[in-house]
Amino acid sequence: MSLNRVIDAKIDKDNPRTAGRAIPAGLISKVETLAFILFSFALLFVSAFQLNMLAVYLLPLAVFFLVFYSYTKRFTWLCHVFLGLTIGIAPLGGWVGATGTLQLEAYLLFFAVAFWTAGFDVIYATQDADYDRGAGLHSIPSRFGIRKALMFAKAFHILSFSLLLWLFAASTLGWVFLVGVLIAGAIMVYEHSLVSADDLSKVNVAFFTMNGVISIVMLIFTIGDLLI
C-alpha cells in the first residue's frame, strides 16, 4: 500500500477525492515512505528465508506483483484483477510458508481472494470513473460505465463465492467453515444492494465496512472449524 501511494502520488494529488492522502497532503514525505517500503521488503526477504525453499523461489513473483499492480491502471482496465491477484498472494504465501507445498486448496483460496478483491475494488473505483476517464487512466468503471461495472463486480463475487464452495468440497474443512462461507455470500449480496448506478452514496459502507465484516466472519468460522 505504501508503494502504491508513492507511485500514485501525482495522481492522488490531482484527484480531488484523494488529494487529502498523506503524501499529497504533505503529512509524510516520499523519502520517509520509501524508507518504510525498503524496510518492509527487507523483512519480507528475511522472513521468506526463514521458512522453506518454495517460499524463497516464489519470493520474486510476490515482489513483482507488489510493484507491478500499481502501474496497471495506466494501461489496462483489468487493473482490478491484478490487484486481486496481488492480494491473493497473501493467503497463498501463508499456505506455502506453513506447508512448503502448493496444492489445489491453496489455488482455490488464492483465486477466491483474488476475485473477491477485484469485485470490491471495482465498486470502490466507481467513485473515480469520471476522473480516470479524463486523466487517461484505465478501470472497468471508466471503460464500461457504472452500471456495467457493477455487473462485473457481481460476476467477480459470484466467482469468489463459488471458489469458496469448491474449497469446502475439496478440503477437510467442515460444516462450520461452510456456514462462514454462506454468511460471507449473504454479506456480498447485501454489499451489492447498497450501491447502484443511480446511487453511489454508500460506496464506502459497501467497500470498507462490508468487506471488513466478511474478513472477520471468514477468520472466525475458519478457526472455529479447525478447533472443533
In which residue ranges do the predicted regions lie?
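Extended hydrophobic alpha-helices typical of membrane-associated regions
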Residues: 159, 166-228
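Juxtamembrane transmembrane-helix boundary signature
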Residues: 1-11
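Multi-pass membrane catalytic core of lipid/isoprenoid biosynthesis enzymes
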Residues: 9-59, 134-179
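Functional transmembrane core segments of multi-pass inner-membrane proteins
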Residues: 56-62, 66, 80-135, 146-159, ...
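Juxtamembrane transmembrane-helix termini
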Residues: 11, 54, 72, 76, ...
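Intramembrane alpha-helical segments
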Residues: 21-108, 189-196, 213
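Alpha-helical transmembrane segments of polytopic integral membrane proteins
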Residues: 4, 120, 186-189
